[in-house]
């Protein structure tokens, strides 16, 4: 009986040590996750990417250096996105669309062009939309399976200055104010 107990105890210690080592390996190999499941934070240089736009052109983030850039991750199946997009159109895009120092790109996640076009027509969006059909660009900024809507504001040096999640009126107002202030500089 005593031998059986000691054998079980030794096996348990071995298993626990192995599990701890495996857990440490996973933690060391994983990305750091910040608030709202972002894997980037304010102050980070925004990860570069190139995506095809709905009009057939391409958009490369690093080519926008020197400009204030807002990325909006969205999708037609996202109710919060549908509620937020008219506000982005009215309060951000319309006042700044002619400003050569400002870039706004909606990034539609996991939808085809055939799905995106009716969606943007329904919500009345006229700002440019890029297609992230596999959510690969989204996964550079947040955990791949985390939710949207998300807005990322990037300064002229390519650094992230603001991250939003969901559509909250006070946070959206702060985003509009931040964009206006950055463009006034």
Regions found by a protein language model. Give the residues of each.
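Short loop/turn microsegments at loop-to-beta-strand junctions
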Residues: 46-47, 69, 148-150
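Thiol/disulfide oxidoreductase modules built on the thioredoxin-like
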Residues: 121-126, 132-180
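Hydrophobic beta-strand anchors of alpha/beta hydrolase catalytic cores
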Residues: 70-71, 104
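Conserved redox-active cysteine motifs that mediate thiol-disulfide chemistry
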Residues: 65, 73-90
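N-terminal targeting signals for export/organelle localization
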Residues: 1-48, 185
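A short beta-strand-turn-helix
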Residues: 40, 50-69, 141
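Structural microenvironment flanking redox-active thiols in thiol-disulfide oxidoreductases
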Residues: 82-123, 134-140
